[in-house]
Amino acid sequence: MTVSESSVLDTEVLVGGSAMPNERPGPMEPQSLSQMPEGFPRRSTVANGVRSRASRRFFVVGGALLLSSFAIYEMGAVFSIGGITPLEYLMLALFAINFCWIALAFCSGIAGFLLLLKKPKPNELAQTELHTRTAILMPTYNESPDRVFSAVSVMAEALSQTGHGHAFDWFILSDTTDPEIALLEEQAFLVLRQETHKHSRVYYRRRRKNVARKAGNVADFCRRWGSRYDHLLVLDADSLMESSTITGLAQRMQADPDAGLIQTIPSLINGTTLMARLQQFAARIYGPVIGTGLGWWVQKEGNFWGHNAIIRTEAFMGAAGLPNLKGKPPFGGHILSHDFVEAALIRRAGWSVVIAYDLPGSYEECPPSIVDLAVRDRRWCQGNLQHSRILPTKGLHWVSRLHLMTGIMAYLSSPFWLLLILTGLMLALQAHFIRPEYFTDQFSLFPTWPIMDSDRALRLFYITMVVLFGPKIFGVLLLLKDGKFARSVGGRIKAMFSVLFEVILSALIAPIMMFIHCGAVMSILMGRDSGWSPQRRDDGSMPWLTLIYRHRWHMLAGVMLGYAAILDSLTLLAWMSPALIGLWLAVPISAWTGSIKIGEFFKRIGILATPEERNPAPICIRAQEARAAYQSHIEQPWTLAQLLKDPALMELHLAMVDKQPLRAAGTPIEPVEAIVHVKVHEAQCQQSALALFNRQEMALVLANPLMLRSLQKLPEQFVPEDLVSFC
């Protein structure tokens, strides 16, 4: 049977029809970064459809510039009494960079705080009939299939009950490379089809080669099936979204013909470890202040965070095709942090990009430990630093460039912070060990005293702390003001204990993350690529020896900084102790925060509680129940040997294999594919062939109907008289 013949079996073998709908190819060309494409920006459909208010930018960005200018002036005045030395100039420059970074967040937080004080109601549209079609995409890469497929199951069922289910199709787009997980995905898809085929259209496709990672996965869908749909609603493997949020996004997109992308602000859920619950609590208490403020002032020049957002297909395919950057990774090659770039390109083309800060019901999960956070941040750091190549792109809106710059600073701020600490330490040691030069070469009746304005320095320190902790303060004030919100996290007293605990623990973790980010930046500057590792999402625990190895340099750095401080004075050591204690205790902090047991203990006593944890949404409860059911459904995974032995099982598998041609005629064959061809051709039986395949080769075979048919023709085991002798 040929590949084309096997596809005919789809509708006969699979419940609910073929694994994927018929293709409707459409162009999605890589965009030029060096020149503005012809016809861009498009003319808005509605008058002022993509215009933003300058007054909001003046309030936030202008306020941040004014605040930064004042702080930089004050810092200069601290040093200027006795003349500014080169080391003090360096410290002033580093202070300016760091302060500008936190001032923007502070002013954005003020806007969010003032807006949330009014308790704004969601911008609800009339429940109009949806006449557009939306593809809901769930990309997955070596994730637990029970998590992914159960989430789609409950969301599809809930959406079908709204009366709008006909307007949506669901797609699980797999880039999985692990053959065992790939077969589990197929089993889970069969269960999903059984559950949903009467009320929803759910599809599954696994790519043979995961070119360009998640961005390439979504782009492959767009080029082959995107033209069938008006919108794409992109989720992540750990995403959940309430049906009202899904329909609300589609209705907003339908109502605004100039909208290119609408991004929700997801709430963090399902954290079991202390680290995950810490992130959940911080995001829930302080996150809305920043998110609301950001959405308010960026207006039509918002951003994309890669998931839990709806995108107009025309805008995405016509304007957001990503080019390959010249050179090799980490700065060249495929664009890793694709989301910021796609949002910038969509806005460049004349579509609006909006952050729907008023739309609830969007959820995601977070890394369970410091180590898992470091693994994720290493990849994000490389992608964000890669944006330095995107900043000069022709035609980008200045706010889009600011988003890119903010992403870069999210990781460069750590080296700048470390340099600021080291410079301050050197100034202290210089004052302690190096004798001042009281009389310079120029004639003077009075000596030059090495002095600073200590009162002004202390005042500036207090101002800096207020700016740094401002968003947290605003979040706490909103919590204390809103009795219902306070009760949802256990009451005001327990909430304040949680806030205090979060501040202390975050202060201990911050220097560890600073050195992790510094290490990531250094490795990228040294030319090391991050790779693409699957994420752990539940248990964050690791053996102590592994943690000692991972944090060895952090502990050593803490000891060296402490030694340098004590050379000056115990007072300096005391001032630096908030940062040093976290480094000294990096291993136990990493172990304890990654522990489910410790996370459950704090959950029992109500510390770091969130409304979503104490009173979870129905969709979250159903997802947990469905996941347990899926785990039981796929507890006996298929194997390639079983597929070869059972023709009916093989037909089921082939019905789910991607129907894209294996290889165009005349194109070079991949080395791994050539190796597999040789192994299959020379194998005496199925048993010997399976013993020769590694995991990569096994995954390739599973995606290749021709190789599977060749293996089927082989006998199951060796027959001694058929052995070939070589002499």
Swiss-Prot record:
Membrane spanning residue stretches: 58-80, 95-117, 407-429, 457-479, 499-521, 572-594
Membrane disposition: Multi-pass membrane protein
EC number: 2.4.1.-
Keywords assigned by UniProt, alphabetized: Cell inner membrane, Cell membrane, Glycosyltransferase, Membrane, Transferase, Transmembrane, Transmembrane helix
Main location: membrane
GO cellular component terms, A-Z: plasma membrane
Pathway: Glycan metabolism; osmoregulated periplasmic glucan (OPG) biosynthesis
Function per UniProt: Involved in the biosynthesis of osmoregulated periplasmic glucans (OPGs).
Family per similarity comment: Belongs to the glycosyltransferase 2 family. OpgH subfamily.
Protein name stated in the entry: Glucans biosynthesis glucosyltransferase H
Recorded name of the encoding gene: opgH
